[in-house]
Amino acid sequence: MNKAGFNSTPEFPKSESVGPREWGEEILVSLVPEKFMMKKLYINKGSKGGLQYHRKKDEVHVIIKGRMLIKYDDGNGNLIEKILEPGDVGHYPPGAVHQEEALEDCFIIEASTNHFNDRVRCEELYGVEVLDGLPTTTEEEIVEK
């Protein structure tokens, strides 16, 4: 027990590369089981993710470097575009349709719930180009760590 009366000590986890991605690199910085995770995302200029939403994952992005074009549903079925710059924050709760495109090489910090493999692609709903990339996952494929 520490002097503050708790059986708790700081942890200093090692970063772990999730592996190279088509769009750049994803590095898992910290994973607190059943609570949250933090990642570093390096996204190459011109890279574009699929138009998607998450069933369970709640995520926040902080733009550290570069400019990112975000497309999102305004809640009325319309896709809106917004440019995020260093210091800007984007919050994507479960069900929020969104797509990212790197206008420059980007470095982003992502904090989110621990729902890996939670992705529903929805380009066809909005009549936009279907990109290559990771497909929709089923609810059974979502992994919570």
Name every feature range the model reports, one short phrase each.
Residues 1-39, 48-50, 82, 125-145:
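A short, N-terminal "cap"/entry segment at the start of jelly-roll beta-barrel domains
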Residues 38-42, 60, 81, 89-91:
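Conserved hydrophobic/aromatic beta-strand scaffold that supports enzyme active sites
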Residues 39, 51, 63, 71, ...:
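Beta-strand residues in well-ordered beta-sheet regions across diverse protein folds
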Residues 47, 56-57, 96, 104, ...:
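A generic "binding-loop/recognition-motif" signal
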Residues 48-50, 69, 88-99:
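Histidine-centered metal-chelating micro-motifs
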Residues 55-74:
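Glycine- and acidic-residue-biased ligand/ion/polar-headgroup-sensing regions
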Residues 60, 104-124:
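A short hydrophobic beta-strand segment most commonly corresponding to one strand
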Residues 74-95:
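Short acidic-glycine-tyrosine-enriched beta hairpin
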